[in-house]
């Protein structure tokens, strides 16, 4: 059965008085087999029937008989004195925070399934946005988008997507002029809570290594991902029917703990069949989140992590996971991650904990003085969209001072401590491979990204009943049932922004993100 046909049949057979219709199928098998030019002798199509995308819907032709438009392209020039425009806002799965850098587009055919994990297409942004987009837009720091030259008519599909996060909706009617989806639709446009929320929805395959000192695994629950997506079962490549897209691994000391961190308990992060022990294991995942373990990560495999990022993987590492990037035993950078920061570690004397909470300044320019559009977007988002700043600064509940990033390093600082002694960089990132080839515009064609955070993101949330020092109880928790659900703490707001930015196509530092190009008639 054509997926789009089953969806459109669902529109016909359901009593859809609502202005937003999620992708689902209903109705009889007889009607689902009907289509333009089917020759089944069934007579006229039922009222409201719309041919599935790509079936019997090619339209105008040029004078020489060649095709001038296909499917919804034929409905893009139906307005006199101007076309149709779509506007609206896009939110996280919880529907709480508007999101930056999310692409919105009208597809001209069914979007293709998104494969899990790292493969030959992982470095290609163009491979993500399938369905032949014919009208596109992208959200700004306020989560707002504008799509111009949209097709007019009934049952117009819209895809919202950032990286491998994707959701799919249908607008029952688009008219000439401006169509404000915030008022026309009864529900918000959100990224999906589950893998199968709509017909073409998708959640990245995410691996999380838990830790003794933080609860990074709970962030995804707070931004709206369903508990049903959490599993202690490693993902397959491709997915192969494994349940859930949030895969929990036991970091130190859960590896030796009798208390499971998931039900069923997840495997060890570093042991055989774990998360980073081999390339084939880690390559199953689109994104890897490493939650602080309370001590230096045991048995890190920097070469495997570097291979993963070079091929398009995305990594968020916090605090003691610096062991992947710096060899504390020799006081030298790991050779796979040279000069990403100047490290000054707790083990080198004096400890690394600030006595109290600190403030951080969001970096809106690069160390060179050049523009940093994504840093400016982060500042604007924290300041006016989610109101997370105190004055102009971001409050950090539990910060550490293990690293400083300056213009002499290959990384980009996103948040620097302000007024704290010693100084530190709280968030920074770098793109890989370090020796990336140049693209046609002369810019490095980076593939993957690492974000390092020198703080505990769950410190203000009281996950697993922790009321003070997370070190005292995080390891006793069960994920995701022990996670606190509620409004994000300000420093966790910043992590949400960075997490979804990490999911997206790698935008070269210093440039502004752009929507994908529109498709031309075939």
Locate the predicted segments by residue.
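A short, solvent-exposed beta-strand micro-motif common in secreted/extracellular proteins
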Residues: 104-106, 133-134, 143, 153-172
């Amino acid at each position: 059965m054509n997926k789009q046909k089953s969806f459109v049949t669902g529109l016909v057979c359901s009593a859809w008085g609502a202005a937003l219709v999620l992708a689902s199928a209903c109705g009889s098998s007889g009607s689902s087999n009907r289509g333009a030019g089917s020759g089944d002798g069934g007579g006229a199509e039922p009222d409201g029937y719309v041919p599935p995308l790509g079936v019997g819907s090619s339209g105008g032709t040029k004078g020489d008989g060649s095709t001038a438009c296909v499917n919804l392209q034929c409905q893009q020039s139906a307005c006199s004195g101007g076309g149709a425009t779509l506007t609206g806002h896009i939110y996280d799965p919880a529907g709480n925070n508007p999101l930056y850098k999310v692409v919105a587009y009208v597809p001209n055919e069914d979007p293709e399934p998104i494969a899990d994990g790292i493969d030959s297409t992982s470095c290609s942004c163009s491979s993500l946005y399938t369905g032949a987009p014919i009208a596109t837009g992208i959200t700004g720091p306020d989560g707002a988008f504008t799509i111009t030259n949209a097709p007019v008519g009934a049952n117009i599909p819209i895809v919202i997507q950032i990286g491998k996060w994707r959701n799919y909706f249908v607008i029952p009617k688009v008219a000439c002029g401006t169509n404000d989806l915030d008022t026309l639709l009864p529900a918000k446009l959100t990224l999906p809570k589950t893998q199968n929320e709509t017909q073409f929805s998708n959640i990245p395959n995410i691996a999380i290594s838990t830790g003794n000192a933080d609860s990074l695994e709970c962030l995804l629950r707070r931004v709206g991902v369903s508990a049903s997506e959490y599993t202690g079962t490693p993902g397959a490549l491709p997915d192969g029917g494994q349940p859930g897209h949030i895969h929990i691994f036991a970091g130190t000391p859960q590896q030796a703990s009798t208390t499971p961190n998931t039900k069923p308990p997840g495997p060890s992060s570093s042991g055989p069949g774990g998360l980073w022990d081999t390339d084939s294991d880690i390559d199953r995942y689109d994104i890897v989140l490493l939650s602080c373990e309370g001590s230096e990560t045991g048995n890190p495999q920097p070469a495997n992590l570097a291979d993963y990022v070079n091929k398009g993987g995305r990594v968020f590492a916090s605090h003691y996971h610096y062991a992947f990037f710096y060899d504390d035993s020799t006081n030298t950078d790991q050779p796979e991650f040279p000069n990403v920061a100047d490290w000054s570690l707790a083990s080198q004397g004096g400890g690394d904990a600030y006595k109290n909470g600190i403030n951080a300044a969001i970096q809106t320019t690069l160390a060179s003085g050049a523009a940093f559009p994504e840093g400016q977007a982060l500042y604007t988002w924290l300041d006016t969209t989610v109101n997370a700043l105190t004055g102009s600064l971001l409050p950090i509940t539990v910060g550490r001072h293990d690293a400083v990033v300056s213009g002499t390093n290959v990384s980009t600082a996103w948040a620097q401590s302000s007024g704290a002694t010693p100084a530190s960089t709280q968030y920074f990132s770098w793109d890989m491979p370090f020796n990336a080839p140049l693209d046609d515009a002369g810019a490095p064609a980076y593939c993957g990204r690492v974000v390092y955070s020198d703080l505990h993101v769950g410190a203000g949330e009281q996950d697993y009943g922790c009321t003070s020092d997370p070190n005292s109880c995080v390891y006793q928790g069960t994920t995701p049932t022990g996670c606190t659900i509620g409004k994000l703490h300000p420093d966790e707001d910043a992590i949400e922004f960075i997490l979804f930015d990490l999911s997206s196509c790698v935008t070269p530092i210093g440039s502004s993100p752009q929507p994908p190009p529109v498709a031309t008639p075939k």
